[in-house]
Amino acid sequence: MSTQLSRFFQNRSWLDAIVTVYGADIDLGNRKAWQKVSRQNAAFARIHDKTYISVTSNFKRILNYSNLRKKFAKKGLWCWWSYLQHGLGFLGLVAPISVAQGFDKVLFASTDEYVYGLPWGSHPTVDGLTQWSNTEVMTECDNWTRLEKIRYIVRLRQPVSLRSCWRDETGGNCCVCRACIVDVASLLTEDANPSAYGYLFDGITPESTLAIFKPGTVMFKSHADEPDYHQWLAVQEILRGKLGKGADFGKFQRFAVKIAQLRLEDYFVDLPPRWQT
């Protein structure tokens, strides 16, 4: 979500509409979560005087990802959705909408995989060259890391609810998975209150979420995790610097200390030599 928001704020003067897809990160069977996310996105669009468009699609359900993985994993395609489908899949859903609405530009959210030169299902050399009718696809922030995008959003001083979690079935953030934890830590590097950005920690303490880092637990498995790994390294460096200067993160103090102290190399299957620090 940080990607979409950073791009929105940079280009909002000419954007006419915001499109959200039901059936991508939220399964078609989870209507309750979709309604929550859709309401939030519609409210965001309304505040910024933009049209809100929602699309419902079974473009993930029609594929057997297990069979695709069995067939193509040996060729490096461990996840069909991530490595191949999602870029052109999203653009394919937006294409008929853009023609019907008369839009001549589509702004497509980037991912930080570009920065590390990894094979990925969304890339400027593919997305940015995709055209139909009189519509062109624009890609920006392609060289920004996820941490840089979060930093940009925080410095706008307009707190919004981010959604980085794929595990929470209510449409929010579980605050206990790797994706949530690293984004909470990223917000702390900018002295931002994670609760103001949608990380609510209902009924749990921030430091208790780090229980997922147990001896022998594998957190980083393949080169597809490289962007996450580098985000963790950058976050740790900043937090260590702040803590060394006596920073006080309030109820997140223990959380920040534990994040800064983690030995990330302990959570790899095999730490690639070029990742070693």
Model-assigned labels for residue ranges:
Residues 2-277:
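Nucleotide-activated chemistry modules centered on ATP-dependent adenylation/adenylyltransferase
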